Amino acid sequence: MTDTLDGGYADPIQAPGTLEADWQAWQGWAGLPEAALDAVTRVVVVAAHPDDEVLGFGGALAMLAASGTEVTVVAVTDGEGSHPDSDLVTASELVRLRTAETRAALAELGAADSTVVRLRIPDTRVDRFEDEVAARIAPLLDGADLLVAPWTGDVHGDHEAAGRAAVRAAASTRTPCWLYPVWMWHWAAPGDPRVPWRRAALIPLSSTALERKRAAVGRFVSQIAPLGPGPGDAAILPPHELAHHLRDREVVFR
């Protein structure tokens, strides 16, 4: 391993993360402007993997759906690479599981009638298909007020590549684009200079939206609970990690 800002871990996502209590105590929340959702009539939300859209933007999706906004979710990959060393679940079984989990989660958000577009790009290799992803997202933006995608600085290869492709698609169609972090809450610290806080905006969640988001996150059983006792079947998002995504606010970069 090479020395890094994360105490010797070459991969910040594998390093011990920032506690949610530290984020909750951060005084910087008060300085973030709010991102308005009231003018959005059609939104396209990009997820590098099934569950990203709920973890990073699920509360906002619940509020948008409740207001009558038309929702399209673009799953860039099917998430088949989440447990490559599992002795219990194959990649094809994960595709089936995670696709069903997405539909169940959207129903919990009150967005059961959302359109879900699966691009079927290979998991862990989105960077090799950025041109294709951008080209396939662009026509989906016809009539959309907003495109939302994973943050391009999230320190996760698929998230960053999906975000870059979305930014390109948005630019080509002149569609406003917001980017949501997922793993940033793990590897960054409050006020972290690696994070573009000047571009950040806050989305306060109503109590109903937060309740819906909690229920939606709970539908991703393949990610939040162990598939079995072996190390290759461990939960991808254990409770201390999920805590970052179950707070009463979400953040986007604009």
What are these regions (language model features)?
Residues 81, 185-187, 210:
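Short, acidic Gly/Pro/Ser/Thr-rich loop/turn segments
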